[in-house]
């Protein structure tokens, strides 16, 4: 019997895979547990359309992520820290950076996406690496000045 897997079944098939299985196994285990559905011409056509739509969605999301990367790498965030005799008071946290991106540039970013981030407590230009979706990484430029 030809079936379409609705969920991953170890040793048998992965989700959305079309595969031939024995009739008894399909009727007695896979179908009652809603792990598969019978592969008819109509259901196969629907599955292919669904997979094509998913692929287009992924491509659109990847394009949007690349646009966000481009935007992040073009902008410079500006912060001010108080200093006294070459000592810096305070620091800039990942949450400060996320808030400025959200407030001034309307970019939503999770602070957990920062790679090996330590609070910034140096005056001057600092670079921060951020991991976006699809394995895309961006570098944010942060300019810290004295008050």
UniProtKB/Swiss-Prot annotation:
Keyword Chloroplast: no
Alphabetized GO MF terms: rRNA binding; structural constituent of ribosome
Presence of keyword Ribosomal protein: yes
UniProt feature coiled coil, ranges: none
A Pfam family matched in the record: Ribosomal_L9_N
Gene3D superfamilies per the UniProt record, alphabetical: Ribosomal protein L9, C-terminal domain, Ribosomal protein L9, N-terminal domain
Record PANTHER family: 50S RIBOSOMAL PROTEIN L9
Family classification: Belongs to the bacterial ribosomal protein bL9 family.
NCBIfam families in the cross-refs: L9
Function (record text): Binds to the 23S rRNA.
Name this protein carries in UniProt: Large ribosomal subunit protein bL9
Organism (species): Mycoplasma capricolum subsp. capricolum (strain California kid / ATCC 27343 / NCTC 10154)
Record lineage: Bacteria, Bacillati, Mycoplasmatota, Mollicutes, Mycoplasmataceae
